[in-house]
């Protein structure tokens, strides 16, 4: 059976947030997945940022598994206090952690992120 476009059915629109300051600018678009995908994915995120210097973020623990598809220079990922656990990655999947991780970018990046549930990422990558 072919799927028909129904004018009565509406999908939630993406929410776009923009910020500009002396340090640079960024834009973030977020949207929920279709209802049928919500047991497997929590959110879609798109971003673009340009800042004047390298930027280091503290990513807090989560019960999700983000898939990051980066269109810019690779990110530098490392565990706090352990420089031996360091990676340079353009695109990657993270897992659930019990502590924060540090992610450094060179100042300009853009990409897409899908925040999967743990079940969703297990089904995707096995």
Give the predicted meaning of each segment:
Residues 2-126:
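Alpha-helical bundle regulatory/interaction domains
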């Amino acid at each position: 059976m072919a799927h028909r476009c129904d004018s009565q059915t509406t999908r939630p629109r993406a929410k776009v947030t923009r910020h500009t300051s002396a340090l640079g600018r960024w834009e973030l678009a977020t949207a929920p997945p279709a209802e049928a995908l919500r047991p497997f994915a929590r959110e879609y995120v798109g971003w673009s940022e340009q800042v004047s210097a390298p930027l280091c973020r503290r990513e807090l623990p989560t019960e999700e598994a983000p898939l990051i598809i980066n269109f810019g220079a690779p990110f530098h990922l490392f565990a706090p206090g352990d420089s031996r656990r360091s990676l340079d990655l353009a695109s990657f999947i993270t897992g659930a952690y019990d502590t924060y991780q540090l992610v450094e970018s060179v100042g300009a990046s853009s990409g897409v992120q899908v925040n999967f549930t743990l079940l969703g990422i297990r089904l995707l990558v096995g």
